[in-house]
Amino acid sequence: MRVYEGKLISKGQKFGIIVGRFNEFIGGKLLSGAIDALKRHGVDEENIEIAWVPGAFEMPLIAKKMAKSQKYDGVICLGAVIRGATPHFDYVSSEVTKGVASVSLETEVPVIFGVLTTDTIEQAIERAGTKAGNKGFEAAVTAIEMANLLKEF
């Protein structure tokens, strides 16, 4: 029996990070977590490229451009969509989720969904580096693991 599993070694790998400016305070915290994870796992700073987009809805397009460029071993999407009084949250969170997944499947480059979809700002803050850890850090670790796992096939 052969078992495939991605390693958490990233020497020489290059990652693109896309961050939504909407809810920038949260996005910035997620970005810090992602950069920390990449550096801790051996990614050189010059192999990390960051693109800021207006909001989560714009992420799939830039993710597709990054993934199709073949410059990156993985792309990490970070941001926060926080529920408000209108159905806008449902539309945005659904479409960005589908868009990110579709880019990954189409390009065969790991495109990692690190976009928080929360009911409150407090929940987002908790997931951006306080009580619930930093989901940006987790997304970066996932990107490293998936980039290495894909090399096995």
Swiss-Prot record:
The protein's Enzyme Commission number: 2.5.1.78
Gene Ontology molecular function: 6,7-dimethyl-8-ribityllumazine synthase activity
Coiled coil ranges: none
Residues involved in (2S)-2-hydroxy-3-oxobutyl phosphate binding: 85-86, 127
Matches recorded under InterPro entries: LS, LS/RS, LS/RS_sf
Pathway per the UniProt entry: Cofactor biosynthesis; riboflavin biosynthesis; riboflavin from 2-hydroxy-3-oxobutyl phosphate and 5-amino-6-(D-ribitylamino)uracil: step 1/2
Active site residues per record: 88 (proton donor)
Keyword rRNA-binding in annotation: no
Gene Ontology process terms (BP): riboflavin biosynthetic process
SUPFAM superfamilies the record matches: Lumazine synthase
Binding site for 5-amino-6-(D-ribitylamino)uracil: 22, 56-58, 80-82, 113
Function: Catalyzes the formation of 6,7-dimethyl-8-ribityllumazine by condensation of 5-amino-6-(D-ribitylamino)uracil with 3,4-dihydroxy-2-butanone 4-phosphate. This is the penultimate step in the biosynthesis of riboflavin.
Homology family: Belongs to the DMRL synthase family.
Name of the protein described by the UniProt record: 6,7-dimethyl-8-ribityllumazine synthase
Biological source species: Alkaliphilus metalliredigens (strain QYMF)
Gene, per the UniProt record: ribH
